[in-house]
């Protein structure tokens, strides 16, 4: 009965206690041996020290055995035992418990278990979704922090240049609409051209400008204006007009170079 209740035998418990005590005893003997070996008498009388330690160990073992024999007897008689007169009065566990259940109660219990399982599945799915959202939010937060770190220098611009940020922002917002309408009108008014054709035209005009800028310095601003206009509008009509002007200018330069 005791073994079934305690899940170990009483003798094994007593043996464990005695073994722990013997281990402490041997540690104490080793400590005494180490202390004597560090004294000045260790080299003069090593044999006497060894004999004294042996007698000390035997004495301790005999004392432990004598007292723990009494401990074993007392434990088995008074702790791990019960009086014989109590045998007829021990109540069996669960003897008066009613485990009967009706069909309605069984069905209600099954229904409750099913509902709890469905709720658990929903909660677990919600938990997975929330974890995924949290992971994405953390990634976005990290990315935003990197971008903020890159543009952190903008916070010092108003202080260094004494710019009134609210008024400047309002002005930029007002001009943004006008700029969008202007770009839209330019795109609608300009015919679509290939970028390669425009690049070739620009290269040709730049070479013509280099040839004409040296002998005719007063035309420098004129051709610079037309080149910047061509690069900004990319209009074939403007390119053709400038091309005609260059041809006429080349003819004029040819006439002036003749003697």
Swiss-Prot record:
Keywords: Cell cycle, Cell division, Centromere, Chromosome, Coiled coil, Kinetochore, Meiosis, Mitosis, Phosphoprotein. One of its GO terms (cellular component) is chromosome, centromeric core domain. The modification Phosphoserine is found at residues 190, 213. One of its GO terms (biological process) is cell division. The modification Phosphothreonine is found at residue 192. It is found in: Chromosome, Centromere; Chromosome, Centromere, Kinetochore. Component of the NMS super complex which consists of mis12, mis13, mis14, ndc80, nnf1, nuf2, sos7, spc7, spc24 and spc25. Interacts with dis1, mal2, mis14, ppe1 and ekc1. Belongs to the mis12 family. This is Centromere protein mis12.
């Amino acid at each position: 009965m005791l073994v079934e209740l305690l899940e170990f035998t009483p003798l094994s418990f007593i043996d464990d206690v005695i073994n722990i005590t013997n281990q402490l005893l041997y540690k104490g003997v080793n400590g005494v041996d180490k202390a004597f070996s560090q004294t000045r008498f260790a080299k003069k009388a090593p044999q006497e020290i060894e004999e004294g330690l042996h007698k000390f160990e035997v004495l301790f073992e005999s004392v432990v055995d004598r007292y723990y024999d009494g401990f074993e007897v007392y434990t088995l008689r008074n702790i791990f035992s019960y009086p014989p007169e109590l045998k007829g009065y021990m109540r069996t566990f669960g003897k008066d418990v009613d485990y009967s259940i009706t069909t309605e109660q069984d069905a209600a219990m099954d229904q409750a278990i099913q509902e709890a399982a469905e709720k658990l599945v929903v909660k677990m799915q919600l938990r997975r979704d929330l974890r995924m959202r949290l992971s994405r939010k953390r990634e976005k937060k990290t990315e935003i922090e990197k971008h903020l770190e890159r543009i952190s220098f903008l916070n010092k611009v108003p202080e260094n240049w004494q710019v009134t940020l609210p008024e400047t922002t309002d002005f930029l917002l007002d001009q943004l609409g006008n700029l969008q309408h202007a770009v839209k009108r330019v795109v609608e008014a300009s015919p679509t051209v290939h970028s390669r054709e425009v690049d070739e035209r620009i290269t040709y005009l730049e070479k013509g400008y280099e040839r004409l800028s040296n002998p005719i310095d007063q035309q420098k601003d004129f051709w610079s204006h037309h080149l910047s206009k061509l690069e900004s509008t990319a209009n074939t009509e403007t390119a053709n007009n400038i091309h005609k002007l260059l041809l006429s200018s080349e003819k004029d330069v040819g006439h002036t170079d003749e003697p």
